[in-house]
Amino acid sequence: MRAEHTIFVCTTCGSKWEGGKRVGESGGEILLKHLQAHYPHWELNTEFRIQPVECMSACDRSCVVSFASHDKYTYLFGDLSPELSPAEVEGIFQCAGKYYAHPQGLLPWGERPEPLKKGILARIPAVPTPLQINCTEAKICN
């Protein structure tokens, strides 16, 4: 079965740079390892994949993750510690579970764990399907 939901993790976040080159392990890579370590035990691991991303352009708000799926909002969260506790990792997975359960992926502020309440960077609308675009154009044109 192919996962239809994705947790993206920026692996450039929290990098140290010397002479224009990245040195050592980034905060994002550490965060990714923590999520991957708990992922096999997560009940939704067949519904989500964890995808490393080279840069998500939120450098001032590292570390960054996002939840994305077809026909759903995409959420971008920042200000996450790379050294997540097991409870914080569980909070991210619980929030992803709420995202999975909601048809449009809506995540009300009060239902998010603390790090994902104050670290919200964006809620991006789903890309309209061709059918939705044609329907909207028909309403505009009539």
Q: Which functions belong to the PLM regions below?
A:
Residues M1-F8, Q36-A58:
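Immediate flanking context of iron-sulfur cluster ligation sites
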Residues M1-G20, Q132-N142:
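Polybasic, low-complexity association/targeting segments
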Residues T6-K21, Q51-S69:
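Local cysteine-cluster metal-coordination motifs and their immediate loop/turn environment
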Residues T11-E47:
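Small-residue-enriched alpha-helical segments and adjacent helix-cap loops
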Residues G24-L31, K72-S81:
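Short cysteine/histidine-rich metal-coordination sites, predominantly Zn2+-binding motifs
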Residues A58, G78-P82, K118:
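Generic structural "secondary-structure junction" signal
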Residues D60-R61, S66-K72, F93-N142:
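Short flanking/linker segments adjacent to small metal-binding domains or redox-active Cys/His motifs
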Residues F77-H102:
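A hydrophobic, small-residue-rich beta->alpha segment in the mid-to-C-terminal subdomain
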